[in-house]
Each structure stands twice: as C-alpha cells, then as structure tokens.
Amino acid sequence: MQAKKPGGSSGGGRSGELQGDEAQRNKKKKKKVSCFSNIKIFLVSECALMLAQGTVGAYLVSVLTTLERRFNLQSADVGVIASSFEIGNLALILFVSYFGARGHRPRLIGCGGIVMALGALLSALPEFLTHQYKYEAGEIRWGAEGRDVCAANGSGGDQGPDPDLICRSRTATNMMYLLLIGAQVLLGIGATPVQPLGVSYIDDHVRRKDSSLYIGILFTMLVFGPACGFILGSFCTKIYVDAVFIDTSNLDITPDDPRWIGAWWGGFLLCGALLFFSSVLMFGFPQSLPPHSDPALESEQAMLPEREYERPKPSNGVLRHPLEPDSSASCFQQLRVIPKVTKHLLSNPVFTCIILAACMEIAVVAGFAAFLGKYLEQQFNLTTSSANQLLGMTAIPCACLGIFLGGLLVKKLSLSALGAIRMAMLVNLVSTACYVSFLFLGCDTGPVAGVTVPYGNSSTPGSALDPYSSCNKNCECQTDSFTPVCGADGITYLSACFAGCNSTNLTGCACLMTIPPENATVIPGKCPSPGCQEAFLTFLCVMCVCSMIGAMAQTPSVIILIRTVSPELKSYALGVLFLLLRLLGFIPPPLIFGAGIDSTCLFWSTFCGEQGACALYDNVAYRYLYVSIAIALKSFAFLLYTTTWQCLRKNYKRYIKNHEGGLSTSEFFASTLTLDNLGRDPVPANQTHRTKFIYNLEDHEWCENMESVL
C-alpha cells in the first residue's frame, strides 16, 4: 500500500497537469474572444457603422446642387436620386428583418456594410466616365477671359465649343444619371440589416432599464453622421471637380464663382473606405453574447404570462438552444407566416399610429433636410460650401444632442407609456412652432431684369417681362447656365451678357439705362437684399433649437414600439417600422418637396433645346411652399400622437382600476407606473391582464410567441 502511494500521487499529478493545461488553453481561448463578447464593444462597432452610413447619406444631400449643375438636372431629378436609396432598402427590409432575426445578426450587418461600401464607390464612378468640365467655354459661350459677355461686336464669336458636340454628350450624361440611381439603390440594399438587426441585438443583451440609453446613443451616432457628411461636403466642394486631371494652379475661378463645380465624387470614395473598415469588425461577434445576469430576471419573457409547457426563449428568434422545434420549419412555411405576423402587428392601433407618426416626423427630415442646403443658397445667397459647413456644424449636432437627451430622459425619469407619448406630443408642438417662424425668416428674390422687373425698371405689365430686350437682343446671350451679376442700378441681371456688357471687365453695360454710360458696370453675384443677414442669423438659431427639440421624440417612440410587441416579434416589428419609414417617410418627401420647389421657378435654363435646371426662384413662394409642407407633416404627426395617447389612456382606464386613466402633474413626464413595473404587480389575479396590456395595448388577439401566430 505504501508503494502505491507515490505512483498514485504521480498519476494524480499528471492528471492535474493535464487539467491545468486544458484549463489554461480554455482560458487563453476565452481571452481571445473576450473583446467581442462585450455588448459595449458591439455598441461601439455598430455606432461606427451607423456613423459611416449617416455620413454617406448626408454627403449625397450636400452635393445635390453640385450634381444639378454638373449633369444639368432638375430638382425633381435629384429628388429621384435621393429616393433611390430608400427603394433599395424597401425591397429587402421585411425579409432581412424576419429571417435575419433567426440568423447570425452581426455577420449579416457586416455583409450589409460591405454592400454599402460598394454602392458608395459606384456613386463616384460617373465623374471618371464622363467628359471633363470646361468652365472656360462651359456648356455656354464665354468671352476670352471666361465671362459671358455680349457678342454683338463679334468678340468671342468663335470662342464657344461646337453646340452639336455638347448635345451629343447628352446621352452620356443620362447614363451617368442612371448610374447614380443604381449606386444609391445598392446603398439602400446594404443598409437593410444595419438598423433593425443592430437595435434588436443590443436590446437583447442589455438590461431593460438601460435599453433606452443604448438605443439613444445608437441613433445619436446615426444622426451625427450627417454632420460629418455635410462637413465633408463643404471640404470636397472647395476642391475643383477635375483636380486630379488638370493643374489647378492655372484656374482663374474660385469656389465663390457661380461656374465653380466642386469635387463631389471625393467624399463617396472616402465614405466607401469608412464603410468597409467599420463592417469588418462585425464578423468577430458571436450570434449571441453570454448572458450578463439571470435571463429570467432581465428578459422581457419574464413579463409574459407563465405557461408550464413553455420553455424560456430569448427574444427575436435567436435560439441559445439549437434544437428548438421550430428550427425544422421550411423556408416556404416561414414565408407563409410573414403576412400573418404583419397583419397581427398592424391590427394594434398603438403600434400602427406610433409608426405612422414616426413616418411623418421622418418625412419632414427627409424632405426638408434634403433641400435645406439648396434653400440656404437661394434664400440667403450662400455658396454651396458655406451652406454645407453651417449645416454640419450647427443644426445636425443639435439634433444629435436632442436624440441623446430623449433617450436619457426615458431612462432617468422612468417614463411610462403615457409619459413617453406626452413627451413626443410636447416636443412636436414646440418644433412645429419653430417651423411656423420660418415662414417669416427669409429674403426676397429682389429685382431681376426681365424676370421680376422690366429692363429700365419702367412700369410695364408683368406679362411683358422678357429676359431679352432691345439692349441685348443682338448679343446672342445663352441660357444654358445662370451667372448673375449685380448692376450699379441695384438690379440683378441673369448674366453680363443680358446686362449688355461688351467687355470682360464688366463695363459698358448697355442695359443699365438709368445709369450714366461711364458708370454702367456690374459685379459678379446677386444684389444683396436689405436685412437678409439678420434674418439668416435668426433662422440659424431657431433651426438649432428646432433640431434639438424635434429629435427628442425619436428614442421614446422606438421604445414604445418595441415594448408593444412580444419579444419574438421585436426584430420583425422593427423591420416593419423601417419598411414604412422608407415607404412613407423617405421616398415620397424628396419627390414632393422637389416638385414643389420646381413649381416656384421663375426662369429655367435650357440645354440643347430642352428645359434644364432652374436658374432663378421666387424666394417668397419657395419659402412659403417649402415650409408649409413641413408644417402640414408635423401637424399630421401630432394628430397621430394624440390618437396613440387616447388609445393608451383608454387602456389605462380599462386595466388599472384605481387609476382612472389620468396622470398627476408629477406623472406627466415621470409616472411611477412604468412599463418595467406594470407587468410585475404583486397581485396574482391581475398579473396576467396587466402583462397582456403591455404587449396588447388594444385588447386584440393575444400573441405570446411565434407559434401562436402560426
């Protein structure tokens, strides 16, 4: 016996060494993946991807006016380009949200980011496939020094290019337009899994009380992206469009010149690189992170009525146990479920109303913001670069702050359903009041010879207005472009040619009839409007306040939405949200706003005998129509918020016997009856009904999990 002890001890030692080595290997293996097993690391990665997505989306908006001039497009045309992103997103959002919830969500998000990177690179391709921009001759005839002057004396008569050659390039321009649309569709397809799967993945792996803060941070980064996009647009439009092909030291124009075209394509290349590198990180995360605490206490399933035959399941259809019964369902059977699930969700008035309200709010952002840079250029006579820089440094950061504050208020004040919807109603009213003030903040078009006032500013009926007059009828002035000049008489002329200037130094302008010939000169640009600078500063301040307050409703709306559906339907509910946001909130508004803006045009340029881009707008009509559309959408959103509040209030009366459906003053923003404790009432008799109320706010057919929908 004594002799066996050393042997046994030695064997035990070897066994202990083996176990120690295995434990050490497991420890090293665990250490290798630990950085991707933290939900905060995923939040950072998702924020980086959403930041890049927001950047490329806003960058397109920042260069829309540049694209108009580069490819001679109308506002309705660029509206189609802006809406193409949503069309691509719309095509796959439901399928990705439904099937992606059961798949490897981080990898799907990474694949979507790579597709977006490809779309961004394709967006820059038209510049390398079309002819170089020639500002000396341009698409019109300029004088020897690059100015459009009167050719009555024969000077500059042979300076312009062959018109037939220019018109033959029209077909190539149309192809570039279609390529831009296709690239935006590809961007939309790639963005499909990023938001719904990212939000549901985060909501699954954080404590419920922290969910609003995490989602608020996520959407803050999504909105901070446009700030980066506008700043990037401001930088790129200061670089000449063909800077990589020519020696820019020989240029005699600056970004302040109306003929300047910036390097609109450069930002797309940079955004493509950012999208690619931020997407690569997503492939390191697991399908499901380790639970941070007892799932029975933190999961939303704990709030559902308990059934003995049901096993606890994580939300969004992500199964920690791979042998669940529904994993054997065929793809065709799962496709048949989608209409039933969609009908079930839309049959809930609270769910439907809050989604439609979000659509109206997003419609204001999509339509108003898409042409806000153009609006600043027209109303306040800013350059494209200055408008983009101001938007990127003022309004958008304020919107980011508003989204973050909205999520923080939901967390810190423990807002109930009624508190959250009342908060949304309040911020909607305040932001609508800001939009109303925009009706009175702007500048007039001012006198424009032959367009708003007759030449010589004589009392001629408006019907007799004509850009061509006896003073310039022999000048062979072209209308391919708009290069306004301000005359010494305080009147704006469409170009130096229309002012009758026969010299490239902008002197001897025959159409300045009220000015002595020796003083008949013009300077480049529109004539300034009195009081315009003060109106612009006020507009900028109000815009910042409006952006911050209006954005505070976004996070409460999303939180209400994901709390009104059963956990298994969360990802799909978010997919329905983003589908309707694209269908109603993102696609129609740019088209509607663009068509409305075109209707206020006073003078159209012509290109090869066809109507080109608008050269001059009626600023007053532009302002009233542009702002009124936004006010109408905000008002409709308020009605939908009110309907949601009425539905919630009715259910509070129905299910909470002692509350009477009203809220005290202290409960206006911070009701102690929160969604967190509403389903955990200690009274067993009411627990089922109150829990049912959380997910079935309008007493429709109750759905506890996916199997009951089948």
Swiss-Prot record:
It catalyses: L-thyroxine(out) = L-thyroxine(in); prostaglandin E1(out) = prostaglandin E1(in); prostaglandin E2(out) = prostaglandin E2(in); prostaglandin F2alpha(out) = prostaglandin F2alpha(in). Signal peptide: none annotated. The modification N-acetylmethionine is found at residue 1. Its main location: membrane. Glycans are attached at residues 153, 381, 457, 502, 505, 519. GO terms for molecular function: organic anion transmembrane transporter activity; prostaglandin transmembrane transporter activity; sodium-independent organic anion transmembrane transporter activity. Residues 1-25 are annotated as: Disordered. One of its GO terms (cellular component) is basolateral plasma membrane. PROSITE patterns: KAZAL_2. One of its GO terms (biological process) is monoatomic ion transport. Gene3D superfamilies: 3.30.60.30, MFS general substrate transporter like domains (1.20.1250.20). Residues 61-79, 132-174, 244-261, 367-386, 439-539, 598-630 are extracellular. Keywords: Acetylation, Cell membrane, Disulfide bond, Glycoprotein, Ion transport, Membrane, Transmembrane, Transmembrane helix, Transport. InterPro entries: Kazal_dom (IPR002350), Kazal_dom_sf (IPR036058), MFS_trans_sf (IPR036259), OATP (IPR004156). Residues 1-40, 101-106, 204-222, 287-344, 411-414, 563-571, 649-705 are cytoplasmic. Residues 465-513 form the Kazal-like domain. It is a multi-pass membrane protein. The chain crosses the membrane at residues 41-60, 80-100, 107-131, 175-203, 223-243, 262-286, 345-366, 387-410, 415-438, 540-562, 572-597, 631-648. Disulfide bonds join 471-501, 477-497, 486-511. Belongs to the organo anion transporter (TC 2.A.60) family. This is Solute carrier organic anion transporter family member 3A1. It comes from Bos taurus. The gene is SLCO3A1.
